[in-house]
């Protein structure tokens, strides 16, 4: 029976459901206040109605929990208390209820997701976590996958933050497909929590309740809330995050580890031109890095990490400005996303984790998710590990229950908790370490000798590849497939009752393999429109280049009378009358210098400037700068955009005919 302090004010529950429901106090709190009698009968009637509205297995759980004479562990499944209604806590509650357990989830504020929905934005649910959800409840997993945005069917990987060039590409599709697992998705944290809470059931979630202490007397656990209320159960699971109160009571005060990085995050209404071919990128830099990901609905989510002391703040409306200063000189993919994000949509938080521990619990209490293995977000596995935790804990509880039912002896809850911990510790510790390694690699990246060397920084002008960059690429190229295979598929053999099958909708583009091997093919598959944007503030208008192999663009000091509809006149001293020509072939653009006196120059995305040889077509790429006649007034930046942010560009001359 739950115990409620007579002096504590009654709390209401918060419903996440979209449909209207009659609100009633939590059943355990009612039993403490009202006892039996007419009120108790009304409560049992409400429980029967609620049971009828839930799936059969959940209804069986309520019926079994409400059965008379169920006071001992040998005659009923144990009552599970869960501190924390985040992703891990709700997944455990769902898994336990589907197996017939009575569950109570205590959450401070379901409507705010403990700030996660606001401060952490969408979450990546990778193949291993989606498979665990399928093993728990297929209908819930289907809803999560419908609501999510698939990213695992595209190119993902690491790129150089300055140039935007690919460093290494990740194949997250093949490891999933080979093991019959769902493909990685990104979903709003709020949406994910609402799906899980709806499946768990409103009657099992007690809102405005914060577990701050507990008493384990060896036979039961009493959870003590911040307002003084007390609830009894057979076990307590601390799923209350990195600053867990349950962890503190178990093992005493311990400090989280500051990663030395602060993180800015935002969501922008922005569609990059390669949205159909690239899911997410990690832009590498020295003591800073940037992550961008498609999250669906025409939005991009990004994270900007910068090495600095903890506790820093920004002046009012100063985040966007500071980010542009930090990432000054970085590639267009980064700068465009920052520029496209409203100031009020940018949030900041310091990044902490906790070192791996081999002691997750004591007695009838254990920990789950961030409360025991909070990790840095670099692998996108923090929430995934919590989902795996929830599944495994429910499995171990059920094993103990079945053993006790067969033997007719009381269920050994303590042993089941220790088995759960033993099953999870090694895998979680390895992935925790990989997340830390990923952060180190992302922030110690040096493309060239001289980067980060202070007085020797002039060496960067020589463009000598840094040995660490070369060695790192070799290691990642051959080590990453093995690592991804184990991270995404290493837990699949433990998923009971889940068939090894792929979803027909999780189909990758038939060019995916080619895109992994050929950067040019990936660029050619990019959507959007190509533009030449003038870098000076002169009279030149942005020029839209549209793919048509039958037409060409003439550049000269005056319009070409033989090509008047596709001619760019630049009346400048260093521009020859018939200076250069731009053509399109196989969805790529080329510039040919027509023997001009002052030449045509290209500065590529690596910062290398070279002269185009006369009468020979040279391919140019996004982010390149093309200089006609070595005149600063005739310099154009190549950009590819899905939507052009400049009104003047929309009205600019259309030079080439669309393909």
UniProtKB/Swiss-Prot annotation:
Q: How does it sit in the membrane?
A: Peripheral membrane protein
The cofactors required by this protein are: FAD
Pathway recorded for this protein: Plant hormone biosynthesis; abscisate biosynthesis
What Gene3D superfamilies does this protein map onto? Answer: 2.60.200.20, FAD/NAD(P)-binding domain
| Deleted gene: phenotype | Accumulation of endogenous zeaxanthin and reduced level of ABA. Wilty phenotype, increased water loss and premature seed germination.
Q: What is its EC number?
A: 1.14.15.21
Record flagged with keyword Thylakoid:
yes
Cysteines paired by S-S bonds: none
Q: Highest taxon of the source?
A: Eukaryota
For whether the record's keyword set contains Mitochondrion, the answer is no
One GO molecular function term of this record is:
FAD binding
What UniProt keywords are attached to this protein's entry?
Answer: Abscisic acid biosynthesis, Chloroplast, FAD, Flavoprotein, Membrane, Oxidoreductase, Plastid, Stress response, Thylakoid, Transit peptide
Task: Give TM segment ranges.
Answer: none
Where this protein primarily resides, as one coarse class? plastid
Q: Name one GO cellular component term.
A: chloroplast membrane
Q: Which residues bind FAD?
A: 79-107, 357-370
User: SUPFAM superfamilies of this UniProt entry?
Assistant: FAD/NAD(P)-binding domain (SSF51905), SMAD/FHA domain (SSF49879)
Describe its function.
Answer: Zeaxanthin epoxidase that plays an important role in the xanthophyll cycle and abscisic acid (ABA) biosynthesis. Converts zeaxanthin into antheraxanthin and subsequently violaxanthin. Required for resistance to osmotic and drought stresses, seed development and dormancy.
**Entries under PANTHER family matching the protein:** PTHR46496, ZEAXANTHIN EPOXIDASE, CHLOROPLASTIC
Q: Can you say what this protein is called?
A: Zeaxanthin epoxidase, chloroplastic
């Amino acid at each position: 029976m739950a115990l409620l302090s007579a002096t504590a004010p009654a709390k209401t529950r918060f419903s996440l459901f979209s449909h209207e429901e009659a609100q009633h106090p939590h059943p355990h709190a009612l039993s403490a206040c009202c006892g039996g009698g007419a009120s108790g009968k009304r409560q049992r009637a409400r429980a029967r109605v609620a049971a009828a509205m839930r799936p059969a297995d959940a209804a069986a759980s309520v019926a079994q929990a409400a059965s008379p004479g169920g006071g001992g562990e040998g005659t009923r499944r144990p009552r599970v208390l869960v501190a924390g209604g985040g992703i891990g806590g709700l997944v455990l509650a769902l898994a336990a209820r589907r197996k017939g357990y009575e569950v109570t989830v205590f959450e401070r504020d379901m409507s705010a997701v403990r700030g996660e929905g606001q401060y952490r934005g969408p979450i990546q649910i990778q193949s291993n976590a989606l498979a665990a959800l399928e093993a728990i409840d297929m209908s819930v997993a289907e809803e999560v996958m419908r609501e999510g945005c698939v990213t695992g069917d595209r190119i993902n990987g690491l790129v150089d933050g300055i140039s935007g060039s690919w460093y290494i590409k990740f194949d997250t599709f093949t490891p999933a497909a080979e093991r019959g697992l769902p493909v990685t998705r990104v979903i709003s944290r709020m949406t994910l929590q609402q799906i899980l809470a709806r499946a768990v059931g409103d009657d099992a979630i007690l809102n405005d309740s914060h577990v701050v202490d507990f008493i384990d007397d060896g036979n039961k656990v009493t959870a003590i809330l911040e307002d003084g209320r007390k609830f009894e159960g057979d076990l307590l699971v601390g799923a209350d995050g990195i600053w867990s109160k349950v962890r503190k009571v178990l093992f005493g005060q311990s400090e989280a580890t500051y990663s030395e990085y602060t993180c800015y995050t935002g969501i922008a209404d922005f569609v990059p031109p390669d949205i159909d071919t690239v899911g997410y990128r990690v832009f590498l830099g020295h003591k800073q890095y940037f992550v961008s990901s498609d999250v669906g609905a025409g939005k991009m989510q990004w994270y900007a990490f910068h090495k600095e002391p903890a506790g820093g703040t920004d002046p009012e409306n100063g985040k966007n400005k500071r980010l542009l200063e930090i990432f000054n000189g970085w590639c267009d993919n980064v700068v465009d996303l920052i520029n496209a994000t409203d100031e009020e949509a940018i949030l900041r938080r310091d990044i902490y984790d906790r070192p791996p521990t081999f002691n997750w619990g004591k007695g009838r209490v254990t920990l789950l998710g961030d409360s025991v293995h909070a990790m840095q977000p670099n692998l996108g596995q923090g929430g995934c590990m919590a989902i795996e935790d929830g599944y495994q804990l429910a499995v171990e509880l059920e094993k103990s229950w079945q053993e006790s039912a067969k033997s007719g002896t009381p269920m050994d809850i303590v042993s089941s908790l220790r088995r759960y911990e033993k099953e999870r510790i090694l895998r979680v510790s390895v992935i925790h370490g990989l997340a830390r390694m990923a952060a180190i690699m992302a922030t110690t990246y040096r493309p060239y000798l001289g980067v980060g060397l202070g007085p020797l920084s002039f060496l960067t002008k020589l463009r000598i590849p840094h040995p660490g960059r070369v060695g790192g690429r070799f290691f990642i190229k051959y080590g990453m497939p093995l690592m991804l295979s184990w991270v995404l598929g290493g837990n699949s053999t433990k998923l009971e009752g889940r068939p090894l099958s792929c979803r027909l909708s999780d189909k990758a583009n038939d060019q995916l393999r080619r895109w992994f091997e050929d950067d040019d093919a990936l660029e050619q598959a990019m959507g959007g429109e190509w533009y030449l944007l003038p870098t000076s503030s002169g009279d030149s208008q942005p020029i839209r280049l549209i793919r048509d192999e039958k037409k060409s663009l003439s550049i000269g000091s005056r319009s070409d009378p033989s090509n008047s509809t596709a001619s760019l006149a630049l009346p400048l001293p260093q521009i020859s009358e018939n200076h250069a020509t731009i053509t399109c072939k196989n969805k790529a653009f080329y510039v040919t210098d027509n023997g001009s006196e002052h030449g045509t120059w290209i500065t590529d995305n690596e910062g290398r400037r070279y002269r185009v040889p006369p009468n020979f077509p040279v391919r140019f790429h996004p982010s390149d700068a093309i200089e006609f006649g070595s005149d600063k007034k005739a310099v154009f930046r190549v950009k590819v955009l899905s939507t052009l942010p400049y009104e003047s560009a929309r009205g600019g001359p259309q030079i080439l005919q669309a393909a």
